[in-house]
Regions:
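Mid-domain catalytic core of redox enzymes
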Residues: 1-60, 66-71
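Active-site proximal loops enriched in glycine and acidic residues that flank catalytic Cys/His/Asp
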Residues: 51-53, 86, 120
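Internal hydrophobic alpha-helix adjacent to the cofactor/substrate pocket in enzyme cavities
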Residues: 131-148
């Protein structure tokens, strides 16, 4: 992930913007400070950019900004690079037949072993969306089991 501070969010709402072209470095962009300003330096927006593959090149922050200029225009010129985190094995390999959601009777999004509910993207699909779905489904099942 590559992180930038910006004067304002490039997004009009709190969403994850996906690269649908299957080209380039960028997989998705989100602005965590659109959800909570506490995530960003004071008075700034925090831009989080997820890349495909491992990139150790010191020029990656500049290359990412060049690519995102096609998405957001000249505003990226004012973005300040904060840090780059290289996360090995960020997403698990997950072939469809190995997907745990196919083997659980409790429903999509979590596993139940004994009386323990297990959630996470590893129980749905290896993605941010998978993690959110899993958390929501697990919370709903837990509330139902409590009679709420």
């Amino acid at each position: 992930n590559v992180y930038y501070a910006a004067d304002k969010s490039p997004l009009k709402e709190a969403i994850i913007a996906l690269n649908g072209s299957s080209k380039g470095l960028v997989n998705n962009v989100c602005v965590p400070s659109d959800v909570s300003p506490l995530y960003a330096p004071e008075g700034k927006s925090l831009i989080s950019v997820s890349l495909l593959g491992l990139h150790r090149d010191e020029h990656i922050p500049t290359e990412v900004k060049k690519e995102l200029a096609a998405w957001f225009g000249e505003q990226v010129d004012g973005w300040q690079h904060l840090r780059t985190d290289i996360i090995k094995h960020a997403l698990p390999e997950q072939a469809p037949k190995e997907n745990p959601q196919n083997n659980t009777k409790e429903g999509k999004g979590f596993l139940k072993i004994d009386d323990i509910m297990i959630c996470g993207d590893h129980t749905t699909s290896a993605s941010i969306e998978g993690a959110i779905i899993s958390g929501n489904q697990t919370a709903a099942a837990l509330l139902k089991s409590m009679g709420k």
